[in-house]
Amino acid sequence: MNLEPINNALSHLRMLRSSVGQVFETLGNGVRAEHGEEGKEQKFLQELQELLNGVNSNLREFETCINDLTPPQAPFNLANTAYLSLETNLERQALYPHLVQSYKWHDKLHEYSTFASVLLQQNSLKRSYYTNTKRRRSLPSSHLATPQTVDNLIGSIHFPNMNLKIVRPFMTNAILHITIARVLRAAVILKGLLIEWVTVKGFDESLLDGVDEHWTVSRHQVFRKVQDHAHSAMLHFFSPTLPDLAIRSFITWFRSYLTLFADPCKKCGKHLHNTLPPTWRDLRTLEPYHEECKQ
């Protein structure tokens, strides 16, 4: 629908209303002081005549624009909104222009969605008309490793003054027993190649007697501190894409406790702080620190 003739007619209508308003304003003011004393009535009539001529000119132009308009071929279907003109409540009458605007917006939305549907059905965004059935290879999961894989990984790790032993009390998941010289012993509970729990005890404490011993903490505070730090390191070295590297890094870090009671703190230079040796080992340099000195 061409809206240019309608906009042109509305523009001339505004000009006509403005010129008529000037006529009534001039009549309301009457003869003014600016007309002077001599011939003021004649000047007033001349001014009024010019305004009326402008009204006639605007009226002819407006009629010409009206004649250029083509009536709609069919009446607009407004459904139940056509009865709003019969409503006397001003609050309900205010809904009419908003509903008309909503209908126009809905028509444009339907038109644009139709064009978009036609373009999308042309399949122009695909490189091929055939569906590729090749699926991406799934990454191996670290907790689904076979027992042979775990045995080969642990068997390839060798450090002096450290003994590694694998037991399987439940036939599936392995428990790695670590003995570091005559300093401490630890039980690392594995689920595939994923470290789930670490228990640290003294060399003279029971750890291999039964499964329940793997979940009880040490009676010595120093080894309880080491166990807490081991849990932090377990989370730090966790890597779902490189689980073998995570286990190697954790065992390398844990072996640094070989000098638990020998090396002083790297920061304060003391062996004891609050009656405890340096129980923290730096995750990169493996240097010993007291828990209060590591910050």
Swiss-Prot record:
One of its GO terms (molecular function) is transcription coactivator activity. Disulfide bonds: none annotated. Keywords: Activator, Nucleus, Transcription, Transcription regulation. Pfam families: Med27. It is found in: Nucleus. GO terms for biological process: regulation of transcription by RNA polymerase II. GO terms for cellular component: mediator complex. Component of the Mediator complex. Belongs to the Mediator complex subunit 27 family. Component of the Mediator complex, a coactivator involved in the regulated transcription of nearly all RNA polymerase II-dependent genes. Mediator functions as a bridge to convey information from gene-specific regulatory proteins to the basal RNA polymerase II transcription machinery. Mediator is recruited to promoters by direct interactions with regulatory proteins and serves as a scaffold for the assembly of a functional preinitiation complex with RNA polymerase II and the general transcription factors. This is Mediator of RNA polymerase II transcription subunit 27. It comes from Aedes aegypti (Yellowfever mosquito). The gene is MED27.
